[in-house]
A protein has these predicted regions:
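Short alpha-helical "patches" and their helix-cap loops
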Residues: 26-32, 80, 134-138
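Extended interaction regions within the primary functional domain
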Residues: 5, 21, 71-72, 83, ...
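Conserved PLP-binding catalytic core of the aspartate aminotransferase-like
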Residues: 48-113
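Generic non-transmembrane alpha-helical segments
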Residues: 37, 41-45, 74-82, 120-122, ...
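Intrinsically disordered or highly flexible coil/loop and linker segments, enriched in small
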Residues: 26, 44-48, 85-88, 129-132, ...
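Active-site C-terminal subdomain of aminotransferase-like
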Residues: 1-70
Length: 150
């Protein structure tokens, strides 16, 4: 039973079902592996990541960056300055505030571990107002790699 649905939620659900039929279990495993890999790398950069256990961050495509409201607002707005959209949340699940990252799209790009390293570094630099030049360089590199995969 679904209530208070929005058209975009239904579209996402339908797309997910189509993807499941077409790509199935392999895609799911890749998506979850990438989520855990990214979470581990972000944790090494000092991000506070929600965990299931010492070694497992998620059993889905989502990872949750736990932050204060002030940190969440700052990080979200910093990312927007670079045309990077993040999913800002203010819920108890996040201990009130945080950022949700999904890895479904990354799984489609077939990125390698070094690309996930770059993504983690990019998010760290954005959150900590790193070098503008370095942020733009990493962002461009990841976009270029994504465009080559199409």
């Amino acid at each position: 039973y679904l209530r208070d649905i929005q058209p975009n939620h239904m579209a996402c659900l339908l797309l997910s079902l189509i993807e499941q039929i077409e790509y199935g279990v392999e895609y799911q495993h890749t998506t979850i592996a990438l989520a855990n890999m990214l979470a581990k790398k972000l944790e090494k950069y000092g991000f506070n990541i929600a965990k299931i256990s010492d070694e497992v961050y998620t059993m889905t495509h989502q990872i949750f960056l736990l932050m204060t409201k002030k940190e969440t607002d700052f990080f979200y707005n910093q990312a927007l300055d670079y045309n990077i959209s993040l999913n800002q949340k203010h819920k108890k699940l996040f201990s009130e505030d945080g950022i949700r990252l999904g890895t479904q799209q990354i799984a489609r790009y077939n990125w390698e571990e070094q690309d996930i390293d770059e993504l983690a570094k990019l998010l760290f630099l954005i959150k900590h107002k790193g070098s503008l030049n370095e942020i733009k360089t990493i962002r461009k590199k990841l976009i270029d790699k994504r465009m080559k995969k199409k």
